[in-house]
């Protein structure tokens, strides 16, 4: 009995080992299904589930309370009461419908949840059944099937070993035949791909070419439009009407229609929203505001009438130019004739030297009235054709600017005239200011005449000669004042003897002034009103020099240093720039330089030598140093760059309240009265 049990146990062990899955065989039994009720019971058996339910009830009740607080109870209750009073049946029906809807929705939700749970349970049960069928076949069937499969594999291996070499060769040939076929098919595929690629490339090339053509056309049309816009200066009347409208129409056609739609799409909604919020007129269903029609369509229509108007205007302009040119020529010839006559009269009237003026003064008074009438007529003629002669005026201005640069070289008077002018200036120094003004007018007139003599030497330039002598016509006003000048010169002769000591110190000054005076031509562009201001400054300077050099030699030491620094700044002009700067400025600049330098030199001499020797020593030193200063002024290229303006020159000597206040104003001396000042108005009262 013991042997049988041992054998039986061995057989059982072999079955377990032979089983490849390693799983113990199960007894065939059905899996139990869990129902929804069982799930609910299992969940709610624990206290945690009940806590969750209570928390949910509390939160949703709080939400309901908040919502009811937000509701307006008065209106709600009043409306409900009114409805109940009017038609209670409707109210009841509405309430029933609402409640049924709520209840139906709630039950549908519950049914969905329950049905989903039931479906999941059914699927789990089916899977369990399938697994049981797969796992529970008898062991014997598996073993038999495995044995049969192994027996079938062994004879197949033996048959394969007996295959002859011929079959192997045939197989190899078959493989070789298959390989070239594969290669051929591969080549065909490559060819097809290449063909498709070439077709695509050709299509792309065509597209690119068409794009390039369209771009070139557009560029050409743009260039044509630009050229036609640039041409109207040369040929406006002919070419513009032909080309510009076409170019504009083409450009309008070329501009694609897409941007217009895009603009509508972009801005239509914006307009709609703005109208909604700002105006409040539009309703949500209303169509948005239509954007205004584009102006591109109306452009060619507008361009044609404008071009016709341009043509008409151009024709009128051409006709006006022709008529204006003919009128200019006629008036220019008439003017030349009248100016030649005035030149001949001027040559006869011009006195050569200042002593001859005494004889001509009586004649000048009678001629003054006649020249005034001529001036009025000339001014009327000049006022009538101002618009028709813009070019003639420009030429006159150019020639005026050119001439004063050339004339000063020939305008230096003879040395005999210098001495006479020096004596005349010494005589004028203590004459009343009213007489000095008139005298200076007379002198300027003489200088202007000498300038005219220099200009008459050049007969080759007819136009500038005539134009300058037109401006020399206002001389008779100055000539009338010569009478008063000559009378006052006779009175001033006894005073010359008293001031003989001053003559030596002022000769150097007068010589330098005489060198620059021929350049003191009346500037062409400036009016005659500025002349009296300059005259006041000149007379004030002369009287101050005379008084200071007589009385206050020791006080000059204090003034020497600051004015020398200022004079260094004013050594700016070169002879090249003297032609450009107006001669009034040149006079005053030279005068300021000599004045400041003279004071500095006198102060140096006063330290070394006693007062009576100053005049003799200062003469020689001044003459030698003034020559050096002239050369220094010529060789100073950097100082050219900042010429002093006209108003600076006029107000250098003192601050009148009109211009800037400069440091050149002379300091009051301790010996002088505090009431005295440098303004020419007060000096008139003192004298």
Curated annotation (Swiss-Prot):
The protein's name: Triadin
GO biological process: cytoplasmic microtubule organization; endoplasmic reticulum membrane organization; establishment of localization in cell; heart contraction; intracellular calcium ion homeostasis; myotube differentiation; negative regulation of release of sequestered calcium ion into cytosol; positive regulation of cell communication by electrical coupling involved in cardiac conduction
UniProtKB keywords: Cell membrane, Disulfide bond, Endoplasmic reticulum, Glycoprotein, Membrane, Microsome, Phosphoprotein, Sarcoplasmic reticulum, Transmembrane, Transmembrane helix
InterPro entries per record: Asp-B-hydro/Triadin_dom (IPR007943), Triadin (IPR010798)
Pfam families, sorted: Asp-B-Hydro_N (PF05279)
Coarse class of the protein's main subcellular location: membrane
Localization, UniProt: Sarcoplasmic reticulum membrane; Microsome; Cell membrane, Sarcolemma
Modified how: Phosphorylated by CaMK2.
Lineage of the species this protein comes from: Eukaryota, Metazoa, Chordata, Craniata, Vertebrata
Positions with biased composition (Acidic residues): 117-130
Composition bias type Low complexity, residue spans: 357-370
